[in-house]
Design a protein with these regions (language model features):
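Terminal alpha-helical segments
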Residues: 1-329
Length: 329
């Protein structure tokens, strides 16, 4: 059993671990199917005349939990398929570009999956979905002269009040990748604090909290206070062809590339044992280690949740765990 996953377990989205069978319809479908009500009037943001937040009431959470489960499975499998696809290019022993880019996207998908398991979703609400949401809000007389726009939203479910709260990405938070990493960083900081706030804090809880804080510190490296360091490194490789990742591989020896490719299986290790803070090995190595930690954390949480279904029929066993087993053969 993973200590990291066990300590995080109390902070799962309540009820998610009990979702059974194959989950196939995500939040986008949930919005369109209209299993919710609207009792809160729309209000403009404090900085513009647009609506940046809306609240939906959820009388029956089962369909919403299935939507979370579906998105978690989809993103988890995308992460593991991406990391599994990394291979060296024959005849180019110093090439590391696709190693870095694929590791980034695997961690990006994994971060999304982790957030879903904690009850948070960074979701793109398109025009069709926003139209349906506005239709429901109109029916309940809560439009107040406004409309929910399309865009990227941070959505979270409050099971105590049975409310699904969505807040739109603001322009100063960058694109969808920056929005994801900002949200992930905020939720990881919050998780670390919650762990230390548990009654009778033990040494193992302190260890897990400290490791999560290390992750957050690394995500804020090199002038990225909102947690977007991984995205900034990805941009250097993907858009600027920097860090010696592409031909002519300036500053990268075959030995250096060999060491970077040794991280291909690092995500299969216990995340607590993956080093995060060392800067001596340079940005690419630290970048890969951080990505591996996030993917490992997602894997450990998925495996832990899959074993907690009351009837041993976890949606994970029909999705991500089944996919991991397929990769092992």
């Amino acid at each position: 059993m993973s200590l990291l996953a066990a300590i995080i377990r109390p902070f799962w989205l309540p009820g998610l671990h009990s979702v059974s069978g194959r989950a196939v319809s995500g939040l986008g479908t949930w919005f369109i199917s209209k299993p919710y009500q609207a009792y809160h009037p729309l209000q403009p943001s404090t900085t513009s005349s647009r609506v940046d937040r809306f609240i939906l009431s959820v009388a029956d959470s089962s369909l919403l939990l299935h939507a979370y489960a579906s998105d978690c499975s989809r993103l988890g499998m995308a992460s593991f398929e991406t990391i599994h696809s990394i291979n060296r290019i024959r005849g180019l022993p110093r090439s590391t570009a696709w190693l870095l880019v694929k590791y980034y996207y695997a961690s990006y998908f994994a971060a999304h999956a982790i957030l879903r398991m904690l009850g948070v979703s960074c979701s793109n609400i398109d025009g069709v979905q926003s139209a349906v949401i506005n239709e429901v809000i109109d029916v309940y007389g809560m439009a107040n002269g406004f409309k929910v726009p399309s865009g990227t939203f941070r959505c979270s479910y409050d099971p105590r009040n049975r409310e699904f709260v969505c807040t739109r990405q603001t322009s100063d938070r960058g694109g969808s990748h920056q929005f994801l990493w900002t949200t992930f960083h905020e939720e990881m900081r919050r998780l670390s604090t919650k762990i230390l706030s548990m009654s009778g804090v033990r040494k193992d809880q302190q260890e897990v909290s400290a490791k999560i804080d290390e992750l957050c510190d690394v995500l804020c490296s090199n002038g990225n206070p909102s947690g977007g360091w991984l995205s900034s490194v990805r941009n250097k490789v993907n858009y600027q062809q920097d860090l010696g990742a592409w031909f002519p591989y300036t500053g990268v020896t075959k030995s250096t590339a060999d060491k970077l490719f040794d991280t291909r299986t690092l995500w299969n290790k216990d995340a607590l044992k993956i080093p995060l803070t060392s800067k001596s090995s340079g940005d690419p190595a630290r970048f890969l280690g951080t990505c591996a930690f996030i993917i490992s954390l997602a894997r450990l949480m998925i495996l832990d949740m899959s074993e907690r279904h009351p009837e041993n029929k976890s949606f994970h066993k029909y999705g991500t765990v089944a996919f991991l087993n397929l990769l092992d053969h």
